[in-house]
Amino acid sequence: MSTGQEEHLDSKLENQISEEENQSQNQNFPTAIEDSIQASIEKLDEVDDEINPIEVKDEFPTTIGTTYDILHPREPFPKRIKLEETETEPDSNGIADNDQTMVVVPPKKPQLFYTPLKTGLVYDVRMRYHAKVFTSYSEYIDPHPEDPRRIYRIYKKLVEAGIVLDPSLAGINEIGPFMLKIPIREATSEEILQVHSEDHLKFIQSTEDMSRDQLLKETETGDSIYVNNDSYLSAKLSCGGTIEACKAVIEGRVKNSLAIVRPPGHHAEPNTPAGFCLFSNVAVAAKNMLKNYPESVRRIVIVDWDIHHGNGTQKAFYNDPRVLYISLHRFENGKFYPGTKYGDLNQVGEGPGEGFTINIPWRSSGMHDGDYVYAFNKIIQPVISEFDPDLIIVSSGFDAADGDVIGACHVTPAGYGYMTHTLKGIARGKLAVILEGGYNLDSISKSALAVAKVLVGEPPENTITLRPQAEAIEVVDEVIKIQSKYFKSLRNGIPNGIFEDVYDLADVEKSNYKLVNIADPIRSHQVEKLFNEKEFINIPIISSPSNGEKPPFTTDLPDQLEDLIVASPDIYNCTTIILTIHDPPEIWANINPTNGVIETNSTMVLEHPLVQIMDKIQKEKDPENQEKFGYLDINIPSFQLPIPGTTSESSTYNPIIFAQEVLLYIWDNYIAYFQQLKNLVMVGFGDSYQSIVNLYGKRPSNEIKDLIKGTVAFLNRTTLKPLIPVMDESMVDWYYQNSIIFTSNFNTCWTGGSGAGNGNGNGNGNNGNSSNGGGNKSADSNGHDDFSKRPRKKFGRVIKAKTDGLCDVIQEKFDEGVDFILDSIEDYSSSED
């Protein structure tokens, strides 16, 4: 294309655009330009065929896009198109500096209700006035765990982190860009009486005028509380501050809130202060929200992650379907404070409130981030989402934090941050975090800071990668089985009928179902193989003596007695007997993930360990050893089927007690009469092994030492049983020297999970820290002074396997166990020679 042609086309384009622009309105500006440019380009098609079409394509693209494409064409472009001679060039942001700036979307106010708001903070130094009356200098230097400095240290930590701006730590009102100070007030009597009785309120009120002696008496006789003349004021401020923290969230003045208050509240019951708590702060606040905001607050969730069960909060809403109470706490079968069964997993509410209480009771100390996160992911998050609350209140005790000797657990600041972050994603972020317990000043301040950061908008500090402990998985599974009755979100992988309800199918009046305990045919298969291949025989049990003697069994017997005990055909004439006692075998199977049904075609049972022992001994025993070997096998059923069609207790059968009694029965009625017997080796598998240790403490030590040459046990997480001799203290050394106990690497004797320390929670708080759990300094139930050491001699010679699970422990340590059996027998034989 020639230069003259280009100039001619440019001139025509400019004239065309100028004419059409003058005739159009401002609002049709983009459309007019595009129409005119398109018309001009169509005229280009009529140009002489001598013009190179490729050059035209390069210089004048035939695809016309947006107005911006026209005003800012790709290079090379011979000349920029101007709409008017006086038009200014757009700036770097594409905005022209004149009155004709194009507006496509007018500026709008951000459609955000949450992000622009601050996090609310409740704090008042007057709550520090509640303090224990000192009676000695030692109480001053070793203060009560519920220390007034708790709230000060948390507030100070927030200031040190820059989240709160208060250099003088005076509790000022203007605290910076991240948090908004919520004015605190005293709770009114009317508000407190929504939860507590009038007598309860009058008692706390009376402490204002009590004498020193009266205050000391109430402190001494109360259930882990102390009082002074300022306790009533502090308690009203703590309760009122909790109400205001929730109120500010509901009214939209803050996006969420953190109430640094004391005294705590979740142990205070309607009629009784307890566990350092005077008024049930969270319960009073929840009642207040439901009453005063009936349109916006219909359902509330209370998540209590204090290490102690919130018995007071649970009682306040036990029959109220509007409040879902969830508690994670150290329980220890009701032995940990508050020391009742009220926090067990089967406590689910009553009346209209049934199904609106969820307890997740840890069996021991030592729980960590992985355990709490697992419970949140499997139970708490799906259940709260299904409940769909209008407000979430957290009873935030930090006594499960790492470093707190009372809780003796290991939740880190990152763990608390993760839990807070999870709850922020529900109920449109309407979350109020209220301080409860926590008695290590460093731990409580660091944990509260992590929560505050997440409330303000920071993500959790770290990703939680720690795996849950087996104990936590088991507890969570038990809770899911119970709560799946009430929450659909927990039913994935759970059978449509609760396991206990399956027995109703066997009611002959209602159906033709006949139930079979799978353990019975498995045992029948085991003994059939022993009968056919090893020619074993049944050993009978006579449960009812004919001569009027006391029955040998205090529990009901299993149904299938004929296969319970089997032995070698010539057991009476054997000089060496290996006795095995075991639980029913483990079953490996694929489980349908939608309904929990076991897929039978993929179900496997490992070969009976006794058969493996017999084969290996036959191969490896000394050929010169002419001892006649015999074998005796005892199977201990795990439980007894209920009587079909009845609601009564079907059986008093207890597998642990039965195992102990049946082994004593075999010793007294069979082994004692084997005249040829010289060597006896005991081999235990699983929980049944405890019966062997029980035998050693119940029968004369000289008989035990003379006959038994060794003890071998294969355990998963079975609690170790100590040998407690009645008379002969040397039995402990004998047991240690002649035993080998293989355990899972997660057995509590190594992890300290079964009661590391004898802390009893809030305990009897009158004696300071010592009464609230000595924590990790005392020995655990498996005899440790330090978890890095081996268990004491009274537990036998304990060896830790590298694996977890009974089958894996057997597979790993089987050869070593059989070698120990052979060494025990052959060493004795050689010593006789």
From Swiss-Prot:
Q: Where is the composition biased (Gly residues)?
A: 760-776
The broad enzyme category this protein falls into is: hydrolase
Q: Which GO terms describe its molecular function?
A: chromatin binding; histone deacetylase activity; histone H3K14 deacetylase activity, hydrolytic mechanism; identical protein binding
Q: Where does it localize?
A: Nucleus
The parts of the chain that form a coiled coil are 5-52
Q: What is its EC number?
A: 3.5.1.98
**Keywords in alphabetical order:** Chromatin regulator, Coiled coil, Hydrolase, Nucleus, Repressor, Transcription, Transcription regulation, Virulence
**GO cellular component terms listed in the entry, alphabetical order:** euchromatin; HDA1 complex; heterochromatin island; histone deacetylase complex; mating-type region heterochromatin; nucleolus; pericentric heterochromatin; rDNA heterochromatin
What are the Basic and acidic residues biased-composition ranges? 1-13
Mind telling me which InterPro entries this protein's record contains?
A: Arb2-like_domain, HDAC_PDAC, His_deacetylse, His_deacetylse_dom, His_deacetylse_dom_sf, Hist_deAcase_II_yeast, Ureohydrolase_dom_sf
- Where do the segments described as Disordered lie? 1-40, 760-791
| GO BP field | cellular response to alkaline pH; cellular response to starvation; epigenetic regulation of gene expression; filamentous growth; filamentous growth of a population of unicellular organisms in response to biotic stimulus; filamentous growth of a population of unicellular organisms in response to pH; filamentous growth of a population of unicellular organisms in response to starvation; negative regulation of transcription by RNA polymerase II
Q: Which Pfam families match?
A: Arb2-like, Hist_deacetyl
The domain of life for this entry's organism is Eukaryota
What does the record give as the function of this protein? Responsible for the deacetylation of lysine residues on the N-terminal part of the core histones (H2A, H2B, H3 and H4). Histone deacetylation gives a tag for epigenetic repression and plays an important role in transcriptional regulation, cell cycle progression and developmental events. Histone deacetylases act via the formation of large multiprotein complexes. Deacetylates the YNG2 subunit of NuA4 histone acetyltransferase (HAT) module, leading to the reduction of YNG2 and NuA4 HAT at the promoters of hypha-specific genes.
Share what the entry says about its subunit structure, partners included: Interacts with BRG1.
Under what name is this protein listed? Histone deacetylase HDA1
Source species of the chain: Candida albicans (strain SC5314 / ATCC MYA-2876) (Yeast)
